[in-house]
Amino acid sequence: MTFAIIETGGKQLKVEPGRYYDVDRLADDPDTKLSLNQVLLVHDGNEATVGQPLVKGATVEVTVMQHRRDRKIIVYKMQPKKKTRKKRGHRQELTRLMVDAIHLDGKALGAASTKKTKKSKASDEAVAVEAEVVAD
């Protein structure tokens, strides 16, 4: 199992290829590809490379999927015996990133697999059969 620990937005995340993660809002448009070079650790299944503080030559290739907002957090402040109450809500702005690949010294350690599920294979076959029928 290939994974890396990266730092983004002042927080550290353990990321794996082919999975998506929500991080603090980035100023990039959806469907853009980014290369994150704040990599603290890379593990390729057999060997771990630990940076001091960063791993030299390590990058994580990601794609911005969408911008979204987290669920609402209620902030309630009250002073007892004073009839003073404040109720506020907060929704954190997030960016959803899909991890495409982890690179170490220019070599891809892990890349998102493009496996097709049984359902998508069946639908592809159905589309091919329809195309043959239409062509006839």
Curated annotation (Swiss-Prot):
Record-level GO BP terms: translation
Keyword annotations from UniProtKB, A to Z: Ribonucleoprotein, Ribosomal protein, RNA-binding, rRNA-binding
Pfam families in the cross-refs: Ribosomal_L21p
One cellular-component annotation, GO: ribonucleoprotein complex
Claim: Aminoacyl-tRNA synthetase is one of the keywords in the record: no
Gene Ontology molecular function terms on file: rRNA binding; structural constituent of ribosome
Family note: Belongs to the bacterial ribosomal protein bL21 family.
PANTHER family: 50S RIBOSOMAL PROTEIN L21 (PTHR21349), LARGE RIBOSOMAL SUBUNIT PROTEIN BL21M (PTHR21349:SF0)
Annotated function: This protein binds to 23S rRNA in the presence of protein L20.
HAMAP family documented for this protein: Ribosomal_bL21 (MF_01363)
Subunit organization: Part of the 50S ribosomal subunit. Contacts protein L20.
Protein name according to UniProt: Large ribosomal subunit protein bL21
Organism for this UniProt entry: Acaryochloris marina (strain MBIC 11017)
